[in-house]
Amino acid sequence: MKKIVSIISIFAIILSATQFVLADYSDDTTITDGQFAYKKGTNNILAYVGTTGICEIPENTTLKGLTPSWAKDAAPITKLIINDNVDINMIISGELVNLNKLKEVEIKEGVTEIPYQFLKGCNNLEKITLPSTIEIIDDEAFSECSKLSTLDLNDGLQSIGRYAFSETTLSGNLNIPDTVTHMDVTAFTDCGNLDKVHMSNNIECEKDKKYCYWFPQTDIKEINIPDTMLNCTNCYFHGEIGRASCRERV
């Protein structure tokens, strides 16, 4: 009987401590609900406070922060799942987002845009899963993700921003879908050793720019040159294939 009482007492103490930790995140402006701390009266997520390391952002929320210092008891995030209709509005620099343990990101169908500097500098990120609904990958979205070695881009993607995948370690083949019409300069700067690149056949020549190149300091063994680039004299390719205008390469 004493043993049962002792076990119940220990369980009660543990439960009480857990409740205290959760309550500690709630104050006049913050409330804890499940694995997240929210700004009171809103759907704004301020922090992940879960203990598994698998962070799944609920639908119809605004993501303002994930790892502030006051959420010190939360497990480091190793997998991040973004559901449909999530407004990603994080401050990347500083204490609000520290994702140095993050290895995998899965973005669900329905999300249409990857914002500026979304996961810049996540140097343990190895895998990203993008939905077919993604239309825009903004500037520096995955730059400096030094362990990211594979990338699958789906039909439906329209625009890739400046330095979007710079300083990654991509290898093998890279397919840039024919739905892509805009790819900003230096999108794939210093991003590994690529065997074969399929460039979108619908990339638009931006004649207002003095130069337009996408792969500086990236080694490429084989690449197609889209018909849209044949008369684009300010278009250059860098890397193993050398620096030459499209007109000169054809």
What role is predicted for each listed range?
Residues 70, 93-95, 115-118, 138-141, ...:
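Consensus positions within tandem repeat domains that build extended binding/scaffold surfaces
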Residues 205-213:
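Intrinsically disordered, low-complexity Ser/Thr- and acidic-rich flexible linkers and loops
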Residues 8-16:
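Bacterial N-terminal signal peptides
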Residues 35, 50-64, 75-88, 98-113, ...:
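Structural signature of tandem-repeat unit edges
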Residues 69-75:
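Short, basic/hydrophobic alpha-helical segments
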Residues 1-9:
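Positively charged n-region of N-terminal signal peptides that target proteins for export
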Residues 30-51:
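GGW-centered surface loops in extracellular recognition modules
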Residues 15-29:
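Sec-dependent signal peptide cleavage junction
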